[in-house]
């Protein structure tokens, strides 16, 4: 079996990172994490996180010494997406192995075991030819013991446009996780993306610091998010995405937070 390197990022999303890594830790051979040495984001804003907690959580998780933290200047440009690309390529080049799995801190793999044990072995012969994509499911907002999730008209969780996440080391990240490789393949991997489902303070921080922050800051979705509550959530229809293309989010569904992951798993057959 071809060895796998995973890369991820430490910044304002650090509180999600250990849980994210835990989903794929057993299935990759090394994990390279990037952290700006000055604690400056891609958008050239300073950030803080609970470093003691993260180091403790990673130490507990890393029973096989797979994790390496690389601290460098990851904000050489004034343009956020250029810094995004720079860091991902830097981490890729630090990897020991050629098969690169890029999974961000706020991404939680729903069906990691099936993906790595069943799908990957069947398709690894193409590891140096085709980039792989997964599908996002996007929780919108947690309120009390409920979570609002972006959904389709039939109430199934809405699947976002596929996202690139696996490539060969010879390729170059050109726009976030999209590379110069034009050959891409959708995989059955489904990922809960916690990009929006966070506190108002943390969401504002996300909007102002992500690689496409220049786009996200101009998008109206934050006001929609801010005013959504348990009384009006069902009134939000065909609302705007976070800055890319003309895609719309059809509606929301309200589920018990404790049932969210079970529901996501039950809908895996809809991944393609």
Question: Model regions: which residues?
Answer:
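Short, well-formed alpha-helical segments that are part of the catalytic scaffolds
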Residues: 13-51
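Short, glycine-rich nucleotide/cofactor-binding loops
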Residues: 7-13
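Catalytic-site signature of metal-activated, phosphate-bearing donor transferases
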Residues: 77-92, 102-103, 108-272
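Cell-envelope/extracellular polymer assembly enzymes that use nucleotide-activated donors
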Residues: 3-5
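Active-site-proximal specificity loops/subdomain of glycosyltransferases
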Residues: 36-99
